């Protein structure tokens, strides 16, 4: 069973659902390509499927997770979701393993009023319940604190109408110690025995130390070879901490001198807005299909057959200072000229979310990604003219 919700269902996901006859619960009138070919179920059927206990369940979006607490408040998956989705509860559960890791929960009012001189800079501030990189800020020193919190408050005001409180809680925040190291994003499911099965392994790129955007993720033979085995072992530890069984997750981690520290875990879904489909282009793994068939990628064989290219996902977003509803048009053709080899270009509905395009692309090295990270996307966006009376 797959639960589909806004903001986005890709053609590939819809085709995978149709081909594999996966039952669907549709929420909030989300647009589903070729909807007539899929098996739609009622929301009430969710509890029936959960009680059966033998059917894999996946969400395509954070937005739909709140139906678990409504229709199955006492189910194991609801409990696990609540723990993993709440960053404070997540950190508390991990604290026996990461004993020296600083974190604290505060309200927005407390963020504005607290004395920052007592904080162990550099720190990260982010919503306790959040999505993507919205509201995530790195603060390196006391002098940066107040201006950053002002910006955070503004972001929360802008996004409060775009996401429900179950997706982004704009009143409760976590302050935590900065996690150093290279960042990876992993799509994985856990078998009935709690064994992790890695379906996707991506590396994240940043423009600079304070960049928290999701603009570039990439993968390659080197990325997989350098990290697969150690991440697999780490996921076994995570599985034991949270008793993860028969559950898919998207986990973000950092690796520094072979120490792996989780940043956050997104339960019951894979990388959002189509990011997980980079695996199809890079090494032929359709995460959704593998999960529902409970198949395991043969990573040794996959790596042996891969070329030496860099396979990347670019998430082109409208700046948080711009109201999406003020966007008139995007010059997609001009934007496309920034890519050497486009594998797939997906324009998005700009007035519904901050993402105006997602692009899967291929390059011989990381130079194209570095250039894309530094590209000013505002030049491709046309806004409504302001009329002053």
Report each predicted region and the residues it spans.
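Conserved N-proximal alpha/beta basic substrate-recognition cap immediately N-terminal to
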Residues: 29-118, 364-376
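Glycine-rich phosphate-binding loop of ATP-grasp-fold ATP-dependent ligases
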Residues: 123-152, 183-187, 207-223
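Peripheral (often C-terminal) accessory segments that flank ATP-dependent C-N-forming ligase machineries
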Residues: 292-389
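Short, charged N-terminal beta->alpha structural module
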Residues: 1-36
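Conserved ATP-binding module of the ATP-grasp superfamily
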Residues: 100, 142-180, 241, 386-387
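Conserved metal-phosphate-binding beta-hairpin within the catalytic cores
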Residues: 239-274, 304-309, 315-323
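Short acidic-glycine loop/turn motifs at beta-strand connectors
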Residues: 140, 190-196, 255-258
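ATP-dependent carboxylate/phosphate-activation module, predominantly the ATP-grasp catalytic core
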Residues: 177-180, 187-243, 266-295
């Amino acid at each position: 069973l797959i639960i589909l919700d806004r903001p986005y269902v890709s053609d590939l996901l819809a085709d995978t659902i149709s081909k594999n006859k996966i039952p669907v619960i549709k929420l909030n009138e989300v647009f589903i390509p070729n909807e007539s070919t899929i098996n739609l179920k009622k929301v009430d059927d969710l509890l029936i499927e959960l009680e059966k206990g033998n059917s894999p369940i996946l969400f395509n979006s954070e937005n739909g997770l709140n139906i678990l607490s409504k229709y199955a408040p006492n189910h194991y998956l609801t409990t696990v979701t609540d723990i993993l989705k709440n960053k404070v509860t997540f950190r508390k559960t991990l604290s026996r393993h990461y004993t020296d890791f600083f974190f604290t929960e505060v309200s927005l009012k407390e963020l504005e009023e607290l004395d920052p001189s007592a904080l162990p800079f550099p720190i990260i501030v982010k919503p306790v319940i959040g999505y993507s990189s919205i509201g995530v800020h790195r603060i390196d020193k006391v002098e940066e604190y107040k201006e950053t919190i002002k910006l955070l408050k503004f972001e929360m005001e802008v996004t409060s109408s775009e996401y429900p409180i179950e997706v982004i809680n704009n009143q409760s925040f976590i302050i935590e110690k900065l996690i150093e190291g290279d960042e990876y994003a992993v799509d994985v499911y856990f078998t009935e025995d709690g064994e992790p099965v890695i379906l996707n392994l991506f590396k994240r790129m940043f423009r600079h130390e304070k960049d928290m955007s999701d603009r570039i993720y990439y993968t390659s033979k080197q990325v997989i070879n350098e990290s697969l085995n150690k991440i697999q072992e780490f996921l076994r530890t995570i599985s034991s901490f949270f008793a993860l069984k028969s559950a898919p997750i998207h986990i973000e981690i950092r690796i520094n001198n072979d120490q792996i520290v989780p940043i956050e875990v997104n339960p019951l879904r894979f990388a959002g807005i189509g990011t997980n489909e980079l695996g199809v282009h890079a090494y032929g793994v359709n995460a959704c299909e593998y999960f529902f068939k409970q198949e395991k990628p043969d990573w040794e064989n996959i790596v042996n057959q891969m070329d030496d290219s860099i396979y990347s996902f670019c998430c082109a977003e409208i700046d948080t200072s711009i109201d999406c509803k003020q966007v008139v048009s995007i010059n997609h053709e001009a934007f496309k000229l920034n890519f050497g080899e486009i594998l797939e270009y997906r324009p998005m509905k700009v007035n519904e979310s901050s993402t105006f395009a997602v692009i899967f692309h291929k390059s011989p090295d990381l130079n194209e990604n570095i250039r894309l990270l530094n590209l000013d996307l505002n030049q491709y966006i046309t806004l409504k003219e302001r009329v002053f009376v």
